[in-house]
């Protein structure tokens, strides 16, 4: 059904609004006879090469790190081909087809090698639900378990992501590991709680050595000692605990208002 799928979305949201001739749109037909698909894929690769290669490749990223329909396990030398879609990819595509039962079991996709030969690659990811896989793609060693991680091998690849999708990246979640920080009260609390998790110690048991061993020596400099930093964070957290509203039903709480932003 030509009204469904990713190409229909591209047509409705992009191609119908720009001045591009239909003959300059090269897509993968969904009705190719099975016996012609291999030849079609070979010819598609030749057409890309004849056109001078792909100038800009724009991608999304699936929940398992797939780019295009290159599922986990795809090798970096893969080219345009027919693939069987796994259950995760079919769920990702559900919104394009209206219902999971409408999603095809197979698809033609550009291969990893084809994508990496593009002059520029841009990957888009938005939302908190993409945070874990974005971190894996950017910060872990490139590997077949996360095909998007192969973009680390490209000389001109960019990830365009919002703050929610970037939320688990070290530079966002634990910035003290990679740069000097502007130590706001909230960031100090987050760093000290993280240090407690790493050392398996309560706040008031943290030592100067703990701070130094885990890259938080800046806080020792800022507060002169682990003791001072510990006390500050302990008191900050303690003051976020409130019993308000409390007391008897209909009791007058006029003289003990709660802060709008206790944390």
Where are these regions (language model features)?
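N-terminal low-complexity segments that are often proline-rich with Ser/Thr-Pro
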Residues: 251-262
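Conserved phosphate- and dinucleotide-binding cores of soluble alpha/beta proteins
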Residues: 2-26, 31-249, 253
